[in-house]
Design a protein with these regions (language model features):
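Short alpha-helical DNA-recognition segment
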Residues: 17-36
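Short amphipathic recognition helices of helix-turn-helix/homeodomain-type DNA-binding modules
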Residues: 64-70
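The alpha-helix within a helix-turn-helix
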Residues: 13, 24, 53
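A general lysine-centric signal
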Residues: 8, 36-37, 49
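A short, Lys/Arg-rich alpha-helix, primarily the initiator
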Residues: 1-15
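DNA major-groove recognition helix of helix-turn-helix/homeodomain DNA-binding modules
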Residues: 47-63
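Residue-level detection of the helix-turn-helix DNA-binding "recognition helix"
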Residues: 11-14, 28, 39-41
């Protein structure tokens, strides 16, 4: 059986009712770049990871960076 890795960034974004352009604005990047990062075509920078973690922690307080990105 194949392991399925859940994309938590995408799942949290959708659960919070956010559109890609809204998260791109939080990260100060283009929507195209955010979309590539969410699809794991391009990696989030460390600064972007921290920004996302801090944003999501407002709603999911027990989330940690290792669980979110690795």
């Amino acid at each position: 059986m194949q392991d399925v890795k859940i994309n938590k960034v995408q799942a949290y974004r959708k659960a919070l009712g956010l559109k890609q352009h809204e998260v791109a604005k939080i990260l100060n990047i283009s929507v195209v770049m955010y979309s590539k990062k969410e699809r794991k075509e391009t990696a989030f920078t460390d600064v972007e990871k921290v920004k996302l973690l801090n944003y999501f922690k407002e709603y999911i307080p027990n989330e940690i960076i290792d669980s979110l990105f690795f």
